[in-house]
């Protein structure tokens, strides 16, 4: 007896394909053309099986495909056609698509999946190496069936949820016997996707052209995609306005330009297509500071933050208040039945008085050294707002400005901070993303992990149990409990839940039509030029 | 010849000192390239990080890293860039062309127009022309290049649509021959203007002051008394002598333009050394950064040498010894 999850998904996917096809008919698709996409930062490598990062997917997603992708109707088969789990959760069987070729003409088979899973997903890929730690082997029972064997139960829904980001097979014949990290194909990827890699001019652009041999017949529509690296946000906005660039994702222009261009009828501006890429703007505490170790103080500080005001002014309304480590985009694992902290500065002051921190002669109760993450404009603005709001309830906050390595070392390795703020992305499933904020025991120097000196045996146990629970319903309940506990104890304030924002030229059609669109393959994207 | 050789030998310890100093200075900055990489990726586990550090040799003590680097540099091996996943030498050669092109066009524009305007202003001191030119110089001098870049971009690209916003060529334009040259030239108009105007104002002001000073000297009066025409006087007697301080400045600024082009290269996304240097600092890409600094120190040494040669050519009283 095997657990089957797929049949409903398949039915939904095929209906979706039909509806999509009819919509496309109605609009009369134009074939050809070059879509130009803005990228803020240069990518080191373009191999998604070595680097789990939206910056990498943004380019490689068109060239290299995952086993499973996510659509608005659920999980969508790409290189896998069917998946199931054994009762004990120790074996997951994945059926692979037949008749698919790599861009160099070699056939795609189970050997590629087995090789990539063991050599890259398990050993080298960030986030994935933790997820696949208990992966023992991948057996190829036939060229198009891969069986993943685990030493500990692996929930099928966790496996599937991880696949869109952490499940890209790479061609074994180009990697086997080489130094994988230095392989030349890491910057010139060979995949099975709708577009073939042509060239990567450092500091300028990446160019990919249509794959004539693509397995989805009749696709893709575009002839070429160009990713242009424009570091300066104002210059990127100018390029959009001049029509030289068609899309800028992940808040690639300044917030002022986001607001300005959203009134411009040449562009679609919004958060569609980022449901799978939501992040939390945070306030992180160093619990080694005895003042902050007091939960009453943390709760009081939360009461001192006017989250709605911050959402309106900083995020221009493109966000919502956070409700703990699972965002509302987290599906069944999310609940809003958790303790919350209304904006009430008077209450905050009373609570701080009660906690034993009255205002002293200096005019403040105590002083905090705050490290803001340098992840773009809105993170800095959030830090400034936080400092201002804290001063209003009598807490003096000194902001220590630093660049990325300085921030990561200051907070996550040297623990040289009282509070910090940054953002952390949710990746489909709490087990492969936000739980690292709460789970203790990670060595100093692990960025984006619980380096806050906060430790709770109860929480650690809950996190470990949820990660290996096979029943999806029970698992969801466990995450609801974790969420409530995190909101009560506030090891970290998950203050604002925000998707990213895209500015897209209306000349692009079928854009932002999946929940992780910027990372997806764009096989149905076309240009009305 | 002996002079050139001596200068060359003198340059070696200077460059070695620069390299060691820079290396140690960079090591003082918090964090290394692995931190920057992990920051870009949005996180990684501890084993991943430790493995990368060992792979990049960053787990060794600083002096071991320095020794290894200097040994490799002695054989002109610049090492591997972990940010670009390419040999540093390849990256530098790729970028050098763009930067030199931008520097050459900007400096020659700034220099020729600057000294011409400066000389004109000086010959008509305190006239309306002088006031106009001096005011213009002041405006150029006071306008930050990033502001000028963005304003030009707004006017010529967004509003008028005459010039491309950035880049060095039209991507996927596949131009060849003269079309390619024209395409690159169109892309260079705004960056050149943005970069050169401030230097233009330097040369203008210096040339104006210098010409006014030289015009009062005895030998100019003597030449005039001997019946030299105004034009001959200007070219042979005044300009040639007035140029000396301007040449000094030009030589000095050659290195500044390398740095000044960071802003312009970043805004116009020109793949040059300035942008690369900036990225390398942010990403803590030691090998690339050291490569750039090595290249720049060589450029500066060579330019200083050429400046000295030019001095001797302009003013025969100066001897190379």
What are these model-derived regions, one by one?
Chain A
Residues 195, 321-355, 374-382:
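Structural transition elements
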Residues 43, 201-205, 210, 278-281, ...:
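Detector for C-terminal structural segments
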């Amino acid at each position: 007896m095997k657990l089957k999850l797929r049949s409903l998904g398949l039915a939904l996917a095929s209906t979706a394909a039909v509806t999509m096809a009819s919509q496309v008919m109605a609009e009369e698709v134009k074939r050809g053309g070059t879509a130009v996409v803005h990228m803020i930062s240069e990518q080191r490598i373009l191999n998604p099986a070595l680097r789990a990062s939206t910056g990498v997917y943004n380019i490689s997603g068109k060239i290299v495909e995952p086993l499973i992708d996510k659509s608005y109707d659920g999980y969508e088969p790409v290189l896998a056609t069917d998946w199931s789990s054994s009762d004990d959760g120790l074996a997951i069987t994945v059926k692979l698509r037949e008749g698919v070729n790599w861009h160099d003409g070699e056939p795609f088979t189970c050997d590629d999946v087995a090789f990539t899973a063991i050599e890259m997903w398990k050993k080298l890929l960030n986030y994935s190496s933790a997820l696949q730690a208990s992966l023992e082997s991948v057996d190829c029972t036939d060229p198009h069936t891969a069986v993943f064997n685990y030493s500990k139960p692996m929930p099928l829904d966790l496996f599937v949820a991880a696949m869109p980001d952490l499940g890209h097979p790479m061609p074994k014949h180009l990697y086997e016997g080489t130094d994988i990290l230095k392989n030349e194909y890491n910057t010139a990827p060979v995949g099975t996707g709708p577009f073939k890699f042509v060239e990567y001019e450092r500091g300028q652009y990446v160019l990919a052209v249509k794959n004539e041999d693509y397995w989805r017949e009749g696709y893709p529509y575009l002839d070429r995609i160009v990713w242009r690296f424009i570091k300066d946000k104002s210059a990127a906005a100018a390029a959009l306005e001049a029509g030289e660039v068609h899309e800028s994702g992940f808040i690639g222009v300044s917030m002022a330009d986001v607001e300005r261009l959203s009134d411009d009828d040449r562009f679609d501006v919004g958060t569609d297509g980022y449901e799978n890429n939501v992040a939390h703007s945070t306030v992180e505490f160093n619990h080694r500071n005895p003042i902050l170790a007091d939960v009453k103080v943390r709760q009081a500080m939360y009461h001192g933050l006017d989250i709605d005001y911050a959402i309106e002014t900083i995020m221009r309304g493109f966000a919502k208040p956070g409700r703990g480590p699972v965002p509302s985009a987290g599906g069944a694992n999310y609940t809003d039945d958790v303790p919350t902290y209304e904006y009430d500065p008077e209450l905050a002051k009373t609570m701080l008085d009660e906690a034993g921190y009255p205002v002293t002669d200096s005019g403040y109760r105590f002083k905090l050294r705050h490290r803001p993450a340098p992840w773009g404009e809105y993170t800095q603005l959030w830090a400034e707002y936080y400092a201002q709001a804290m001063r209003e309830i009598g807490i003096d906050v000194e902001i220590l400005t630093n660049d990325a390595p300085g921030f990561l070392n200051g907070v996550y390795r040297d623990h040289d901070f009282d509070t910090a703020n940054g953002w952390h992305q949710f990746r489909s499933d709490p087990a492969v993303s936000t739980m690292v904020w709460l789970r203790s025991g990670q060595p100093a120097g692990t960025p984006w992990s619980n380096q806050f000196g906060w430790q709770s045996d109860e929480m650690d146990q809950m996190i470990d149990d949820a990660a290996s629970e096979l029943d999806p319903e029970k698992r969801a309940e466990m995450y609801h409990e974790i969420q409530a506990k995190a909101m009560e104890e506030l090891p970290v304030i998950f203050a604002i839940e925000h998707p990213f924002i895209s500015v897209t030229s209306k000349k692009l059609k079928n854009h932002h039509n999946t929940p992780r669109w910027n990372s997806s393959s764009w096989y149905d994207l076309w240009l009305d030029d | 010849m002996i002079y050139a050789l001596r200068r060359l030998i003198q340059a070696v310890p200077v460059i070695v000192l620069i390299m060691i100093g820079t290396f140690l200075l960079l090591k003082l900055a918090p964090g290394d390239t692995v931190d920057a990489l992990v920051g870009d990726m949005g996180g990684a586990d501890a084993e991943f990080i430790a493995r990368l550090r060992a792979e990049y040799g960053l787990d060794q003590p600083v002096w071991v890293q320095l020794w290894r680097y200097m040994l490799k540099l002695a054989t002109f091996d610049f090492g591997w860039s972990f940010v670009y996943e390419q040999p540093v030498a390849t990256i530098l050669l790729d970028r050098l062309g763009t930067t030199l092109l931008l520097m050459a066009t900007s400096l020659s524009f700034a220099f020729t127009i600057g000294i011409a305007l400066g000389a004109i202003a000086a010959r008509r001191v305190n006239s309306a022309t002088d006031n106009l030119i001096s005011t213009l110089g002041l405006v150029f001098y006071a306008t930050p290049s990033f502001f000028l870049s963005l304003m030009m971009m707004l006017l010529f690209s967004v509003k008028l649509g005459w010039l491309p916003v950035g880049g060095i060529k039209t991507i996927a334009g596949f131009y060849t021959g003269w079309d390619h040259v024209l395409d690159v030239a169109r892309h260079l108009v705004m960056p050149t203007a943005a970069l050169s105007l401030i230097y233009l104002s330097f040369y203008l002001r210096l040339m104006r002051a210098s010409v006014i000073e030289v015009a009062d000297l005895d030998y100019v009066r003597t030449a005039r008394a001997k019946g030299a025409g105004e034009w001959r006087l200007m070219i042979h007697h005044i300009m040639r002598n007035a140029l000396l301080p301007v040449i000094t400045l030009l030589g000095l600024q050659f290195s500044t333009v390398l740095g000044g082009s960071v802003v312009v290269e970043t805004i116009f996304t020109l793949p040059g050394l300035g942008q690369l240097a900036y990225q390398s600092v942010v990403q803590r890409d030691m090998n690339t950064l050291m490569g750039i600094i090595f290249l720049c120190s060589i450029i500066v040494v060579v330019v200083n040498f050429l400046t000295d040669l030019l001095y001797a050519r302009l003013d025969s009283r100066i001897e190379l010894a």
